[in-house]
Swiss-Prot record:
Residues 88-123, 124-159, 174-209, 212-247 form the EF-hand domain. Ca(2+) 1 binds at D101, N103, D105, R107, E112. Residues 45-88 are annotated as: Disordered. Residues 56-69 have a biased composition (Pro residues). GO terms for molecular function: calcium ion binding. Keywords: Calcium, Metal-binding, Repeat. The keyword Protein transport does not apply. Pfam families: EF-hand_7. Gene3D superfamilies: EF-hand. Residues 45-55 have a biased composition (Low complexity). This is Probable calcium-binding protein CML22. Ca(2+) 3 binds at D187, N189, D191, Y193, E198.
Amino acid sequence: MSCQVPTVPASPVVKFPLLPRGLLSYLPANLSSILPVARGAASTCEASSTTTTTMPPEPPASPPPPKKMSPPGAGAGAGSKKKQQQQADAAELARVFELFDRNGDGRITREELEDSLGKLGIPVPADELAAVIARIDANGDGCVDVEEFGELYRSIMAGGDDSKDGRAKEEEEEEDGDMREAFRVFDANGDGYITVDELGAVLASLGLKQGRTAEECRRMIGQVDRDGDGRVDFHEFLQMMRGGGFAALG
């Protein structure tokens, strides 16, 4: 029995945990050289009990190219720009779907997905791929058709803002890690505070002109010591470093 593709309502948006966000947007146009398309071979969906060789249907037709952007001031509205973006996204979706649909039958099987991801350097266990397909396979035929693939694609692209927030958070965490390493350099005994003696020792080892005397180190610490305990904790150290570091206190 060959795979059937009944018309069904669009499946709910499902996050794809296996592909990095944005992967579909930066696949090169010449990816066909990496993923050769073997047209004409029959596919077998996991939900099928038997295999029947049929003529593959025509691959999804790409939508017309977006209209040329009007020059500034020519009256191109936000609606026109949005439509052009939608057309560009649809064209990209069709191109990427065709690359994964190795035999051009309008469906992506688990084997095709596994093989294509492997060639992209993203090996994924077969059982995980089967679970992913099951989550987005709205019609239950064991394959991913272009509509189901579109839901997957849109869920990835809709995460763009989240991705930016994620990158900003990663950068902040990376900066925090760097600052903690620097703090540990000053905090010689690891008690979570930088004392006058510890500050003087590090500044002397760095050959800086600041902090050559205990009184000078005490004055420098006093400029950033918010709680008045005569020491610098990590949060005080972080604020100071963002303001130029100990050298800015000289």
